[in-house]
């Protein structure tokens, strides 16, 4: 049975939307101007930035007395509370599994935080397994993390697909591992010339349909 490798944040769950929701509420609570949302989004860098950097940036910009540790926890809790599993995404995962695919999440991040996302949203019920960078000591785009995912699933990378939104981590990593890929464009244009996705889709449901139809 072929592997279906999946990114987590902004692929299976809308991490960007959850962060925006928290950020708007937080900025409103401290009386910051609405246009500061753009600054905060740039610091977060679509989740690629460190939560500690976001916390320190907020403390410095607004002279907040709250400790960095407490602010980091507030940010993480605020995002977690807003994450939801779209029922249509759950349905698409179930269809892919029924079609013979083995869904495995491959994600960069802290083990506790990423596992909490999987369990609190209910995604864990639709996956064969998951691989988290902190746990295995290697991050996307290193192809080793994809090999670990195959080992976890007792499968092979031959015939596998990777679905994700990050050009470097997901698509670059898949290319290095010799795996076909679907890039979730999210309204963006592909810019990288060294490698490219096998397919492009607007969202994860369309991406999963592409993978299922490829057999």
Put a short name on every predicted segment.
Residues 1-91:
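N-terminal helical cap/lid subdomain that shapes the substrate entry/recognition surface
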Residues 1-2, 90, 94-97, 101-215:
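Asp-based, Mg2+/Mn2+-dependent phosphohydrolase catalytic module
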């Amino acid at each position: 049975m072929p592997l279906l490798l999946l990114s987590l944040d902004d692929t299976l769950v809308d991490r960007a939307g959850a962060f925006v929701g928290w950020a708007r509420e937080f900025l409103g609570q401290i009386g910051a101007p609405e246009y500061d949302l753009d600054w905060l989004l740039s610091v977060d860098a679509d989740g690629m930035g460190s939560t500690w950097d976001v916390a320190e940036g907020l403390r410095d910009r607004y002279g907040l007395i709250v400790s960095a540790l407490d602010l980091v926890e507030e940010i993480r809790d605020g995002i977690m509370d807003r994450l939801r599993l779209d029922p249509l995404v759950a349905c698409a995962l179930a269809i892919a599994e029924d079609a013979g695919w083995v869904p495995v999440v491959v994600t960069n991040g802290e083990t506790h935080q990423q596992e909490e996302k999987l369990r609190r949203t209910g995604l864990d019920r639709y996956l064969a397994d998951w691989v988290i960078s902190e746990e295995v000591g290697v991050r996307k785009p290193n192809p080793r993390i994809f090999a670990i995912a195959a080992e976890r699933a007792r499968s092979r990378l031959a015939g596998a697909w990777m679905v994700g939104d990050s050009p470097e981590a997901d698509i670059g990593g898949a290319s290095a591992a010799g795996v076909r890929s679907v890039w979730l464009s999210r309204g963006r244009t592909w810019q990288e010339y060294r490698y490219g996705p096998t397919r492009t889709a607007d969202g994860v449901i369309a991406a999963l349909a592409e993978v299922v139809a490829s057999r």
